Amino acid sequence: MTSIHRGVLFPVYLPAVFLGVPAQAVLILLPLYVLELGGGVAAASAVVGLRGVGMMVADIPAGMLAARFGDRVVMLFAMILIGSAYLTYALVNEVSWFYLLAFINGAGSSTFLLGRMSYITAACSPRERGRVISMIAGSMRGAALLGPLAGAALAEFIGFEATFMCLAATVVLGFLCVAMTAIDDPPDLKKMRWRAVTDLAFEYRGVFATAGIASITFMLMRAARTVLIPLLGAELGLETTVIGLVVSVSAIIDVALFYPAGMIMDRHGRRATAVPSSILFAAALAALSLANDFYSLLAVAIVLGVANGLSTGIVMTLGTDLAPAARRGEFLGLWRLLTDLGSAAGPLTVSLAVTLGSIQAAALCVGALGAAGSLVVYRFVEETLK
C-alpha cells in the first residue's frame, strides 16, 4: 500500500466500508420492516423518501457545522446520528416513528459525507485526491453489492431488530476509526450565519453555473441509468434474471474502471475523464431508445458501465478542487446540495417523460439533457488540477 493510501486508511477508507455497507443494507431493510410492522406500500415509500429529504435538508447546515467545528467533529457527530437511528429502528415498533428516524438517518448520512469530503480536501494534495476519492467511490460500489445481500440474509436468520443492532455496531467501528486516527483541524469559532452561505453562493456563482451544472448532469445521468435499464428490459419482455444479468455486466465494467479513473484524473487532469465520460453517458442514454432486444440492451449497458466507471469520483473531486480553503465547509455544503438535486432529478425526469410519452422518449430526454451537460463540461469547465 502506497503512502497516499496509508495516510487515509483508518480515518477515511475503513469508515467508508463500516458506514457504506449498512447504508446500502438499510435501503432494502427499511421498506421491508415497515411492511412487516403493518405499514402499507405508501408508508414504506414515504420512509425511504424522507431519508433522501433528510440528506438534502442537511447539506448546507452540515457545511456550516464543518466550517465552525472542524471535519473530524462533524464526522463523529454524524456517526452518532446514524448509529442512534439504526439502534432506534430496532427498539420501536410504531411505523410513525420511522418517518422521523429516516429523516435523521438521512441527515446524518449527508453530514458524514460532507465531513469526509472536507477532510480529504485538507488531508490530500490535489494530485492525490483523484485516487483517494476513486477508492471511496469503489468502496461505495462494493457496498451497493454487499449491503443488500448481507442485510437481507441477516434479517432472514436473526430478524430485523437484531440486524439493525448489528448495523449500529458496525457504525461504532467507523466511529472508533475516525476518533482515534483522524487529524483535528482547527475550527473557525465564528457564528454560523445563513447570510455567509448566500454570499458565498453569489461570490462563486460562475463556478456553480458551470462546474455545478456539470455535476448535476453527471448525477442525473447516473440516477436515470439505474432506472432506465431495468424498465426498458421489462418493456422488451425480458425475464427478471436476464435483466439482472444486463445490470450485473454493466456493474462489473463500472467497478473495473474506478481506480484507473482516479489515476487518470491525478496524472492527466480532471477533464481527461470528465469530457469523454460525459459524452459517452449522453450518447449511450440516447441509444437506449434504439435498443430492441437483449443484445442491443446489453451493448448499451456496457457502454454505460464504461461511462460511469470512467466518471468515478469526478463530482467529488471537482468539488474538493474548487472549494476555497477559507470557506471549505460552506462551499461543499452547497456543492452536495446541487449533486443531491441531480440524483433526485434523474428518476423524476424518467417518470415524467414516461408519463407523457414512453420509456424510449424518457431515454431520449435524459440523453438530450446529458448532451447539454457534456457541452457545458467541454466548453466551460476549466481544468482544476493545479
What are these regions (language model features)?
Residues G38, G70, L91-N93, G269, ...:
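Helix-breaking motifs and short loop linkers at transmembrane-helix boundaries and internal kinks
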Residues A58-G70, F258-G269, V354:
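Helix-to-loop junctions at the C-terminal end of transmembrane segments
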Residues H5-G52, A209, R222-L232, L236:
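Helix-loop boundary and gating motifs at the non-cytosolic
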Residues F103-M140, L318:
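Cytoplasmic helix-loop-helix junction between adjacent transmembrane helices
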Residues A169-D188, G373-V381:
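C-terminal membrane-cytosol helix-exit motif in multi-pass small-molecule transporters
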